[in-house]
Amino acid sequence: MAALVSRHTEHFATAPQIGPHDLVEIAAMGFKTVVNNRPDGEGGAEQPPNAEIEAAAKAAGLNYAYLPVISGQITEQQARDFAHLLATAPGPLLAFCRSGARSQNLYQLAGMVASSAPASRQ
């Protein structure tokens, strides 16, 4: 599993599809939050259901979020939701999808929407 993780920053990494059996190792690698960006059923019978991955993540002491996105169809709201997760979820954070590329694209879009957000009024 460690060889498949791509670290983008000290606080963020991506990975291809993980399974429930990977969560203990992910926790041992120091991650605090796991985000599933892959819609349930997208990969057919070989893809573990979100509920199984979430249960294994929680059993391993990890925070978990499900933010499914469709490749090539990421919305601005999904990018904003991901930016919120990045800002509020305990890190480091590991996001995954089928190959890791969709999670990386979502991360880049989240950075764009976060940097374009108007400053809060005081």
Regions found by a protein language model. Name each.
Residues 97:
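Short cysteine clusters
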Residues 1-94, 105-122:
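Cys-dependent protein tyrosine phosphatase-like superfamily
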